[in-house]
Amino acid sequence: MSDNDELQQIAHLRREYTRGGLRRNDLPAEPLTLFERWLGQACDARLADPTAMVVATVDENGQPYQRIVLLKHYDEKGMVFYTNLGSRKAHHLENNPRISLLFPWHMLERQVMVTGKAERLSTLEVVKYFHSRPRDSQIGAWVSKQSSRISARGILESKFLELKQKFQQGEVPLPSFWGGFRVNIEQMEFWQGGEHRLHDRFLYQRENNAWKIDRLAP
């Protein structure tokens, strides 16, 4: 198959979105109410990793980067995730706290985009979550100097076994280089696929401690 033939095949990959629409009268006043409903439906549908979200940050040169991270908590204060504080995303957020999150629930023909500013979590919040993780995951947090270059996977595996022996007694301590961020939500956009590419999009935007809701063209 030539490169041109392959491109033609990709160009024709499409499907109709038929699962249903989203109407203004169906929207709650608070975006997290709708998010909770949609997340619950994603869980009920047994989607793989329904809390997985694409996290977008920007470096000092304006170059955007994305990666998939798991949402670990949300409430009226914002959305929370955890990471190695030496990671690329953590360094980006230290210099520029602007951030975007995307929940791609393809099977439900939905996506939710969140934009706002990220702030570091308190040590108390981080410790509480860290010790709720499986013990091997706690040890794994010690192993990796995230985003640094390594020559082989065996380095990680050897370090894991070494630390598992070291921490076999008692509680695994919280690494000083491990923490979390809370995304203070400024906007949330809900997208529902529609027939003939006439998708439904609604934008919640915070204004004066209230939420303004607008329908956007698809």
From Swiss-Prot:
Its EC number is 1.4.3.5. Coiled coil: none annotated. Substrate binds at R14, R15, E16, Y17, K72, Y129, R133, S137, R197, L198, H199. FMN binds at residues 67-72, 82-83, 88-89, 111, 146-147, 191, 201. GO terms for biological process: pyridoxine biosynthetic process. Gene3D superfamilies: Electron Transport, Fmn-binding Protein, Chain A. PROSITE patterns: PYRIDOX_OXIDASE (PS01064). One of its GO terms (molecular function) is pyridoxamine phosphate oxidase activity. Binds 1 FMN per subunit. It catalyses: pyridoxamine 5'-phosphate + O2 + H2O = pyridoxal 5'-phosphate + H2O2 + NH4(+); pyridoxine 5'-phosphate + O2 = pyridoxal 5'-phosphate + H2O2. Its cofactor is FMN. It comes from the Bacteria. Pathway: Cofactor metabolism; pyridoxal 5'-phosphate salvage; pyridoxal 5'-phosphate from pyridoxamine 5'-phosphate: step 1/1; Cofactor metabolism; pyridoxal 5'-phosphate salvage; pyridoxal 5'-phosphate from pyridoxine 5'-phosphate: step 1/1. Keywords: Flavoprotein, FMN, Oxidoreductase, Pyridoxine biosynthesis. Homodimer. Belongs to the pyridoxamine 5'-phosphate oxidase family. Catalyzes the oxidation of either pyridoxine 5'-phosphate (PNP) or pyridoxamine 5'-phosphate (PMP) into pyridoxal 5'-phosphate (PLP). This is Pyridoxine/pyridoxamine 5'-phosphate oxidase. It comes from Citrobacter koseri (strain ATCC BAA-895 / CDC 4225-83 / SGSC4696).
